[in-house]
UniProtKB/Swiss-Prot annotation:
Catalytic activity: uridine + ATP = UMP + ADP + H(+); cytidine + ATP = CMP + ADP + H(+)
Protein's recorded name: Uridine kinase
Enzyme class of the recorded protein, top EC level: transferase
UniProt EC number: 2.7.1.48
Subcellular location: Cytoplasm
GO biological process: CTP salvage; UMP salvage
Keyword line: ATP-binding, Cytoplasm, Kinase, Nucleotide-binding, Transferase
Gene3D superfamilies, sorted: P-loop containing nucleotide triphosphate hydrolases (3.40.50.300)
Residues noted as binding ATP in the record, renumbered to the chain: 15-22
Involved pathway(s): Pyrimidine metabolism; CTP biosynthesis via salvage pathway; CTP from cytidine: step 1/3; Pyrimidine metabolism; UMP biosynthesis via salvage pathway; UMP from uridine: step 1/1
Family (UniProt): Belongs to the uridine kinase family.
Gene that this sequence comes from: udk
An MF annotation (GO) of this entry: cytidine kinase activity
Length: 211
């Protein structure tokens, strides 16, 4: 699909796990009049391929550290989309803790929303973005959301979610994720509940599409 813009626009949405990044991304996409001109990418798709790593070790990997992500692949595929070339988007199997063999064929779009905990961490990826957003949500709310998601959607036990949160999620948030807030053009408090911020971002992107 060829868009009308000379160059696609990339908006990066960062924030801690459970902050409301995905909700905001989908709310914006749903509010845009021309749905076929906008796409959403999740940084979660770019976790490293751990196929050769034993399951016991996979379960102990720190998935909230920057090294857990295949940043070169993410950067390369963003560049492909910027040049109006389709990509084969990797998929990640959270139950097996590794990359799936299946990919998703994705055509370029005029607006690319990239959401993930560390999308603002890598300078090269950050430099590809036109708008950088950080979603700032209370720690307790984020933990409850993550707990519900991981147990319902990813088959995790209560103890494993709590242990992971205390062992890696919270420390990595403080060390790597929260500091990327300084790179944001827009800081959104209250996550996906912030209708004013969602409306503002939607209006901005709609005006870009209408040019």
């Amino acid at each position: 699909m060829m868009g009308k813009l000379e160059k696609p626009v990339i908006i990066g949405i960062a924030g801690g796990s459970g902050s409301g990044k995905t909700t905001i991304a989908h709310e914006i996409a749903n509010n845009i009049n021309e749905h076929d001109r906008i796409m959403i990418m999740s940084q979660d798709s770019y976790y490293q391929d751990n196929t050769g790593v034993p399951m016991e070790k996979r379960m102990k990997i720190n998935y909230d550290h920057p090294d857990a992500f295949d940043m070169p692949l993410l950067e390369a595929q963003l560049n492909q989309l910027l040049h109006r070339k389709p990509i084969e988007l990797p998929t990640y199997d959270f139950t097996q803790h590794t990359r799936s063999n299946e990919t998703i064929h994705v055509e370029p779009a005029d607006i690319i929303i990239l959401e993930g905990i560390l999308v603002l961490f890598n300078e090269d990826i950050r430099n590809l973005m036109d708008i950088k957003v950080y979603v700032d949500t209370d720690d307790d709310i984020r933990f409850i959301r993550r707990l519900e998601r991981d147990m319902k959607e990813r088959g995790r036990s209560l103890d494993s979610v709590i242990n992971q949160y205390l062992g890696t999620v919270k420390p990595m948030y403080n060390q790597f994720i929260e500091p990327t807030k300084r790179y944001a053009d827009i800081i959104v408090p209250e996550g996906g509940e912030n209708d004013v911020a969602i409306d503002m971002l939607t209006t901005k992107l709609q005006s870009v599409l209408n040019q």
